[in-house]
């Protein structure tokens, strides 16, 4: 460890001074410097590069387990603990999660129009059986940008989304319209959301009724009833929007689009579906 420290910093301080400060001889250091590296050391160096490449490709969002899964997919045999060690050595840390901003109580209501039929069963045996929905907000210098999304619990794929400067019913309606357009008119589909006025609005309820969608809603004030949706928005903010400053809503809108359509759906490894991306999970299921 001492010789490694000297090798790393001898371009900053004189080698002799470093050796004296650490209590080692210059001869010993140069002998260590010229000895052949072990096979393990060479292997670690090659793997360090691949670990870092996977981490950076995820926009610095992957922890050791997802990086490890990336490497296994590429045919690189290595252990999870080794990946953890190499990430520590390079100070590669996934961004910490931030708390979601509290919702505006003026836009929520307590009167449910539907019971909680999902009942926290966040799995689906087939596509287009269970969709979950909600919206969140992203701050810009122009004000809030509201982001609505619809997720298929079968693959955790974002099948519909919408963005607007206001959180009117049209915001969530447009997200559901996109989901139906992408996936086709559903058959025996359960749609779960909270009790927000957007989802209880006549406009949104009529869209669901016209398409034969069964409505399910969380209990009042219980975020765990839609925990999978909360998890997606937490990932969006942790991995993309939470550490950025947007000058305009259009800039934020483009970045959210990029996160959903170019990273989350096609690339991001999801623990719930075996550490593959939503689109890859659907491909393996024969849907692509």
Regions found by a protein language model. Name each.
Residues 1-288:
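Charged DNA-binding/catalytic regions of mobile-element recombinases
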């Amino acid at each position: 460890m001492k010789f490694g420290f000297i090798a790393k910093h001898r371009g900053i301080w004189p080698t002799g001074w470093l050796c004296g400060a650490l209590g080692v001889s210059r001869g010993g250091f140069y002998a260590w410097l010229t000895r052949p590296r072990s096979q393990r050391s060479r292997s670690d160096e090659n793997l360090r590069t691949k670990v870092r490449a996977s981490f950076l490709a995820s926009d610095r969002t992957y922890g050791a387990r997802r990086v490890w899964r990336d490497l296994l997919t590429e045919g690189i045999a290595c252990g999870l603990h080794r990946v953890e060690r190499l990430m520590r050595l390079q100070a590669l840390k996934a961004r910490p999660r931030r708390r979601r901003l509290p919702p505006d109580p003026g836009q929520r209501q307590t009167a449910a129009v539907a019971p909680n039929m999902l009942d926290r069963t966040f799995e689906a045996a087939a596509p287009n059986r269970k969709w979950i929905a909600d919206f969140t907000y992203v701050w810009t210098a122009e004000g809030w940008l509201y982001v609505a999304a619809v997720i298929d619990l079968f693959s955790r794929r974002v099948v519909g989304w919408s963005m607007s400067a206001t959180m009117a019913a049209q915001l969530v309606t447009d997200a559901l319209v996109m989901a139906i357009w992408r996936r086709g008119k559903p058959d025996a589909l359960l749609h779960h959301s909270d009790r927000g006025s957007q989802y209880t609005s006549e406009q949104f309820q009529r869209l669901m009724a016209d398409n034969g969608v069964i409505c399910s809603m969380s209990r009042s004030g219980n975020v765990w009833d839609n925990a999978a949706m909360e998890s997606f928005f937490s990932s969006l903010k942790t991995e993309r929007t939470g550490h950025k400053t947007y000058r305009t809503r259009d800039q934020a809108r483009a970045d959210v689009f990029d996160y959903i359509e170019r990273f989350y759906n096609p690339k991001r490894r999801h623990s719930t579906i075996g550490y593959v991306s939503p689109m890859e999970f659907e491909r393996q299921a024969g849907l692509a």
